[in-house]
């Protein structure tokens, strides 16, 4: 089965072709980072308009890359939610218009299911079941993944997502957009232990997260720098140490909770997905801690940690392979800006 995947939930337009026999044939992505940088965040209306401009050129690109003709495609998968309503509508409309013109069925995909399944795109994918750490700008969750469509929430953030905390910390420190990669880069130049920040809910006894207090601790520390009248090189060193303290605290919590989830479920495999899953400090800490305890950790390719069409095409192929009745051939569709992953069933 050959599936075209279309991702448009936020500020990346992604298209890809996935074949159940040959794997990922082609994927192309356009990021809107440069467009939103002047605003310090994603502007929904601009995001929607840009998806309209980018989708068809990206389609032509993946078709040319793979030598695929429209007659070769069996179905079209699109991100149905969650995400920005306007952005979702653009992707859904394009998917259904193509499907109508080409006489193909469609299937709507949960964006987070795409992330959960994205590590299956590697050459040696992890077998089910596994624990998944889904960590991104909008979500931080630990899930038990028994099979496609069989997901149990083990823990989740009670306030800010980890990626959101990274972005807000970057803004507090005075870094550019997008903040997550910038604060991580700065942290690598900081001195370990120079600034020690709290590890929220580290010993809470459950698998939930909280990152708002960590963000507040960063703000408090910045006020101390201001009161001390730090400037110039001294201020830059202090900011680097603060970034290091923040990243170390966030990573410690993510690692500890992930290991606790593996222990609770008695599973041996952890899958890490979502944009923050590309963070080098998190990958290194998780891999080291897991290896000491005999656990395996699986990551998607770095290029597939961000939102992308490949994960949507894969999820569509897996769903249609198991449940052909989910194929929609009447081209009526809805989008779901809010959509609980735990409610998703086969």
From Swiss-Prot:
Chief place of localization: cytoplasm
List of residues binding Fe cation: 111, 115, 307
Keyword terms, alphabetized: Acyltransferase, Cytoplasm, Iron, Metal-binding, Transferase, tRNA processing
Co-factor note (free text): Binds 1 Fe(2+) ion per subunit.
Catalyzed reactions per annotation: L-threonylcarbamoyladenylate + adenosine(37) in tRNA = N(6)-L-threonylcarbamoyladenosine(37) in tRNA + AMP + H(+)
Pfam families in UniProt: TsaD
Localization of this protein: Cytoplasm
Lineage top rank: taxon: Bacteria
Disulfide-bond pairs as recorded: none
GO molecular-function terms, A-Z: iron ion binding; N(6)-L-threonylcarbamoyladenine synthase activity
Binding positions for substrate per the UniProt entry: 134-138, 167, 180, 279
GO cellular component, one term: cytoplasm
Listed EC numbers: 2.3.1.234
Gene3D superfamilies, A to Z: 3.30.420.40
GO BP, one annotated term: tRNA threonylcarbamoyladenosine modification
Cofactor: Fe(2+)
Function of the molecule: Required for the formation of a threonylcarbamoyl group on adenosine at position 37 (t(6)A37) in tRNAs that read codons beginning with adenine. Is involved in the transfer of the threonylcarbamoyl moiety of threonylcarbamoyl-AMP (TC-AMP) to the N6 group of A37, together with TsaE and TsaB. TsaD likely plays a direct catalytic role in this reaction.
PANTHER family per the UniProt record, alphabetical: TRNA N6-ADENOSINE THREONYLCARBAMOYLTRANSFERASE (PTHR11735), TRNA N6-ADENOSINE THREONYLCARBAMOYLTRANSFERASE, MITOCHONDRIAL (PTHR11735:SF6)
The family this protein is said to belong to: Belongs to the KAE1 / TsaD family.
Record-given protein name: tRNA N6-adenosine threonylcarbamoyltransferase
Organism: Burkholderia cenocepacia (strain HI2424)
Highest classification ranks of the organism: Bacteria, Pseudomonadati, Pseudomonadota, Betaproteobacteria, Burkholderiales
Gene name per UniProt: tsaD
